[in-house]
Curated annotation (Swiss-Prot):
This is ProSAAS. Keywords: Cleavage on pair of basic residues, Golgi apparatus, Neuropeptide, Secreted, Signal. It is found in: Secreted; Golgi apparatus, trans-Golgi network. Residues 162-187, 206-234 are annotated as: Disordered. Residues 221-260 are annotated as: C-terminal inhibitory domain. A motif (Sufficient for inhibition of PCSK1) lies at residues 239-244. GO terms for molecular function: endopeptidase inhibitor activity; serine-type endopeptidase inhibitor activity. Proteolytically cleaved in the Golgi. Big SAAS, Little SAAS, PEN and Big LEN are the major processed peptides in proSAAS-overexpressing PC-12 phaeochromocytoma cells (lacking PCSK1 and PCSK2 endopeptidases). Peptides corresponding to PEN and a proSAAS aa 40-59 have been detected in wild-type PC-12 cells. Interacts via the C-terminal inhibitory domain with PCSK1 65 kDa form. Coiled coil: none annotated. Its main location: secreted. Expressed in adult brain (all major structural regions), adrenal gland (medulla) and spinal cord (dorsal and ventral horn). Expressed in pancreatic islands. The keyword Secreted applies.
Length: 260
């Protein structure tokens, strides 16, 4: 309480007066604290008047004590209110001081960020409140930005290790586009009869080429290739087998006898 602004500022008179009133009410009046002096009374005096005068005296003592207790409670509430106001004023002053400190730190950071190079002549510190650095510092304070976060934004962060790794080379697979697809579609089709013939050879597993009949297209190719020269013996044998297959009639299917 010694360094309180309420005791040293313009409110010191009101607080001092409340403290004095509180001390005065806590101290009992001398009429209540002094012991009453017993007056000598005669033996012939009656005891009834004494009983009548004792009751108002007891009431008079009880009434000031109740008023004093109520006044003490009022003063205690007023003193608590003043102490709460003092605490709020102190917290407000501390917040203002912290805001001023942040403003000074931001101004120094901005001044260091925009400082000229070593070759340039040094400039005098700018304390103008309308300077760009001060205006930016006030704007940042209004936005409640952290000075540490601002410093982290001003200093460039190191590049991650993943960005420094070399990328694999990109190989050119040739031109792509609709023209290439059209060119791929122009490939010659395979004869389905030849495919069926080859598939039958693979499934039967026969090693002799004469085991299965050749397709008609192959027979025509053999007939067209025959010229005035004498064909070899294996070609003549193949032609004879083909002719026998063409002349032979298909066998009738056997009839199944049904039971009577």
């Amino acid at each position: 309480m010694a360094g309180s602004p309420l005791l040293c500022g313009p409110r010191a008179g009101g607080v001092g007066l409340l403290v004095l009133l509180l001390l005065g009410l806590l101290r009992l009046p001398p009429t209540l604290s002094a012991r009453p002096v017993k007056e000598p009374r005669s033996l012939s005096a009656a005891s009834a008047p004494l009983a009548e005068t004792s009751t108002p005296l007891r009431l008079r003592r009880a009434v000031p004590r109740g008023e004093a207790a109520g006044a003490v409670q009022e003063l205690a509430r007023a003193l608590a209110h003043l102490l709460e106001a003092e605490r709020q004023e102190r917290a407000r002053a501390e917040a203002q001081e912290a805001e001023d400190q942040q403003a000074r730190v931001l101004a120094q950071l901005l001044r260091a960020w925009g400082s000229p190079r070593a070759s340039d002549p040094p400039l005098a510190p700018d304390d103008d409140p309308d300077a760009p650095a001060a205006q930016l510092a006030r704007a940042l304070l209004r936005a409640r930005l952290d000075p540490a976060a601002l410093a982290a934004q001003l200093v460039p962060a190191p590049a991650p290790a993943a960005a420094l790794r070399p990328r694999p080379p990109v190989y050119d697979d040739g031109p792509t586009g609709p023209d290439v697809e059209d060119a791929a579609d122009e490939t010659p089709d395979v004869d389905p009869e030849l495919l069926r013939y080859l598939l039958g050879r693979i499934l039967t597993g026969s090693s002799e080429p004469e085991a299965a009949p050749a397709p008609r297209r192959l027979r025509r190719a053999v007939d067209q290739d025959l010229g005035p020269e004498v064909p070899p013996e294996n070609v003549l044998g193949a032609l004879l087998r083909v002719k026998r297959l063409e002349n032979s009639s298909p066998q009738a299917p056997a009839r199944r006898l049904l039971p009577p």
